[in-house]
Regions:
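Inter-lobe coupling/hinge segments of SF2-like helicase ATPases
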Residues: 203-209, 213, 217, 227-663, ...
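Accessory, non-ATPase domains that flank or precede helicase/AAA+ motor cores in DNA-metabolism machines
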Residues: 1-367, 379-395, 676, 702, ...
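Short coil/turn motifs at beta-sheet boundaries
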Residues: 1, 16, 34, 82, ...
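A carboxyl-terminal module marker
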Residues: 671-694, 719, 732, 736-739
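Extracytoplasmic/periplasmic
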Residues: 660-675
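Hydrophobic, Leu/Ile/Phe/Ala-enriched alpha-helical segments that form helix-helix packing faces
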Residues: 511, 595-598, 673, 677, ...
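Short conserved micro-motifs at the rims of enzyme active sites and ligand-binding pockets
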Residues: 664, 694, 713-714
Length: 742
């Protein structure tokens, strides 16, 4: 019998070991090993046992056979990687800059096997007459617990063991005594854990609008004809994108296919899951970070076994091992949380398209405010674009009031609530309607502005706001430009130059001062630390247990509250002035989403946008819910500045404990890239936005080019340089088309 060999990636994340090592497959494991399997192998001079993953199997020996070590065995509890996921891991490694073991662990949704839940039941063996006779005997002997159990058995043939020991209060010894006399027997069975806590309701199939029907018909026509592509649905808030997703999923299930529904935040899971569960029942499940290891493992096993058709979750749900995936839906595709912030820094949108290729599936992106990347690609014909232009309720979009905070200050109002917002809140409270107050803190990085005229201190070289640092200096986190904090506004001469520091707690306190007795709920990082906190807050507000919901960006994403008729956006300028080229896009997206929360029921809605820059195109376009005008302005800025999507961008971040060593390596690497690729545009190096975390210093430089593959070559150049130099106690991270300033 010919000898078989396995190429193995070892479970050590180090650049020197980022390659395959060949091992001989012992006879006893020949029939148990396949690509993706987790194995134990002797490694290094000391032959210490470590884990590894098999990526290929063959009969060609790369070295002298006597030098090839043998696989030691299979570890307990470790899960393997699905065959298609190995190819995906290789793609992630190449395109995002990481080791193969990091990529393999990324595509493993459940890391360990876990025993199934054991269910024990007591099953009656005696007929009812015999049982009643035994019951009478126990009552005469005053065997109270035994009699209680026999009475229950006489009324039902099967009783769950948990109910016996819990509700009936009967001990295990008493149960065993009944089993011993032949009155009943204990039966054990195993089942998968199901993390879905919602109750199935009435199945509803809404009447489709002509726009919705067109999308469904054309997507399915393409699919049935064997055409595979990515679709972008640009639908205003309340236009019925979710119904389109559900109809498409239903059609995929009829065709024997499964679907993955990606959502941007854990906070969306409860409401989204409820809608899907009401439609598809227990064939729906969820995959997210709040699940226990047992729950994660069981959802993967249920998916592989064909027990579920739909999985819902954030970007990690993308790696669910369905056997015949047909559709990936990416709702709110513009959201930053679709980009991983840890290595590998993959984007779910690009990765979903690669997964779809492997399964011959399709991708449907949906948003009221598509990312510039998605809309840009649709414009170039890479995606097929559909529009949903009408609200399903038939209602109008909310009336929007833009309040100039400079004018409020001039007229003596120093409150965080403008007079218009106070007037409308008073009206809603008197009518028993609900209000959402949104603090736009996303991307806040210590920007400084003039409270009198609204002027923001900006970098003269990068057209992003400068960030305030200790020592009274302002710094640009792209090119490193720095200047002292001015004492007077350079535009109007005012001395009112400062940053915005209000948080949700202060807003809640001020609201209660203004309206004693008002019922409030807060949704922010502090109030959503526990596993079920999102669901509890959303459910309480939906049930009318509060008049006002106060929160950050998580409260404006996709939630439907029919009684909300007013949305107040307290500080639109916070995200607008983040030191980030995407600041305008993020502001427009958040404001549009926030405004869209009002008037989603039968009652009309209103929104108030408070800002120091009422004429900025991100503000005016959001107030008008005019995406096209915003896109035309913003894409012009990106093209002129050479930012994504008009070009691609790579951030190379250098870490280390000694700042001088980090700075020197950043400079040397920048020089190497410049000398090898002098056609590139390079920014930096400069200290990172947060220049030190846990005593680790961070520097960054950026490379820009029209072709993504050119930046992959930059990554390869940096990696090869590091292999030659072998710097000690320093590490590198790559971030392609970063969504946040590093």
């Amino acid at each position: 019998m010919r000898t078989l060999y396995a190429d193995i990636i070892v479970d050590i994340s180090h650049e020197k070991l980022d390659k395959t090592f060949q091992y001989r497959i012992p006879e006893r494991l020949r029939d148990r090993l396949e690509p993706g399997a987790c194995v134990m192998i002797p490694f290094g001079n000391g032959n210490r046992l470590i884990k590894g993953y098999v990526v290929s199997i063959g009969d060609q020996c790369q070295f002298a056979p006597e030098k090839i070590k043998e696989i030691a065995g299979l570890p307990e509890k470790e899960t393997g990687v699905e065959d298609k996921m190995i190819a995906l891991a290789a793609w992630i490694r190449r395109n995002y800059g990481c080791t193969m073991i990091q990529a393999l662990k990324t595509v493993l949704p459940a890391k360990q096997t876990v025993k199934k839940l054991e269910h024990r039941q007591l099953v009656r063996l005696m007929n009812r007459e015999e049982l009643l006779s035994l019951l009478g005997e126990c009552e005469r002997k005053k065997q109270v617990a035994k009699a209680r159990l026999l009475k229950a058995l006489s009324e039902q043939e099967t009783i769950p063991y948990e109910w016996i020991t819990g509700k009936l209060g009967v001990s295990a010894a008493t149960v065993n005594s009944i089993v011993k006399v032949g009155a009943a027997k204990l039966v054990s069975s195993e089942s998968y854990r199901n993390p879905v806590k919602v109750q199935a309701g009435e199945t509803t199939h809404n009447t489709l609008s002509s726009e919705q029907q067109t999308i469904i018909t054309e997507v399915l026509t393409d699919f049935d004809a064997g055409r595979r592509q990515t679709y972008l649905i640009h639908g205003i808030t309340g236009s019925g994108k979710t119904e389109v997703y559900m109809q498409l999923i239903g059609e995929m299930i009829k065709r024997g296919r499964q679907a993955i529904v990606l959502i941007p935040e854990i906070a969306l899971t409860y409401q989204t899951l409820l809608r899907f569960y009401q439609r598809f029942g227990d064939r729906v499940s969820v995959m997210n970070s709040t699940l226990s290891p047992g729950e994660k493992y069981d959802q993967c096993e249920r998916a592989k076994a064909g027990e579920i058709d739909v999985i819902i979750g954030p970007r990690s749900a993308l790696f669910t091992p369905f056997p015949n995936l047909g559709l990936i839906v990416m709702d709110e595709e513009q959201e930053n949380s679709y980009k991983s912030e840890s290595t590998p820094k993959y984007h779910a949108r690009e990765t979903a398209m690669e997964v779809a290729k492997l399964y011959k599936a399709i991708v449907v992106l949906g948003s009221a405010t598509p990312s510039l990347e998605a809309y840009y690609r649709a414009g170039k014909g890479e995606y097929r674009l559909f529009h949903l232009t009408k609200r399903l309720t038939g209602g109008e979009l909310p009336t929007v009031h833009t309040v100039d905070l400079r004018q409020e200050l001039k007229e003596g109002n120093r409150s965080i609530f403008s007079r218009k917002l106070q007037e409308l809140m008073t009206d809603r409270l008197s009518k028993g309607q609900q209000t959402i107050l949104f603090l736009n803190r996303r991307g806040y990085a210590g920007f400084v502005s003039c409270r009198a005229c609204g002027e923001v201190m900006k970098c003269p070289h990068c057209d992003v706001s400068l960030s305030e640092h200790k020592g009274g200096r302002l710094i640009c986190h792209y090119c490193g430009y720095t200047q002292p904090l001015p004492k007077l506004c350079p535009k109007c001469g005012s001395k009112y130059i400062l940053g915005f520091k209000a948080g949700t707690q202060q807003i809640e306190d001020k609201l209660k001062e203004l309206y004693p007795g008002v019922r409030t709920l807060r949704m922010d990082a502090d109030t959503t630390r526990t596993k079920d906190s999102y669901e509890k807050i959303l459910s309480a507000f939906s049930n009318g247990e509060a008049d006002v919901l106060i929160g950050t960006q998580m409260i404006v994403k996709g939630h439907d509250f029919p009684k909300v008729t007013l949305v107040g956006i307290l500080a639109a300028d916070l995200s607008l002035n983040a030191s980030d080229y995407r600041a305008g896009e993020r502001t427009f997206q958040l404001l549009t989403q926030a405004v869209g929360r009002a008037g989603r029921g039968a009652l009309p809605g209103e929104a108030v946008i408070q800002t120091y820059q009422p004429d900025h195109y991100a503000i005016t376009c959001a107030a008008a819910q005019d995406y096209k005008s915003f896109y035309e302005e913003e894409i012009l800025y990106r093209e002129l500045s050479g930012y994504p999507p008009a070009a691609h961008m790579l951030a190379v971040q250098i870490y280390g404990k000694e700042e001088e060593n980090v700075k020197q390596l950043a400079r040397r690497l920048t020089d190497v890239v410049k000398s090898n690729m002098d056609f590139l545009q390079i920014l930096g190096p400069t200290p990172a936005n947060i220049s030190k975390i846990n005593d680790i210093y961070r520097y960054v430089f950026y490379a820009k080019h029209a072709e993504y593959d050119t930046l992959v070559a930059v990554k390869d150049c940096v990696e090869e340089t590091l292999r030659q130099w072998q710097p000690r106690q320093l590490s590198i991270q790559f971030d392609f088309d970063p969504v946040n300033v590093l």
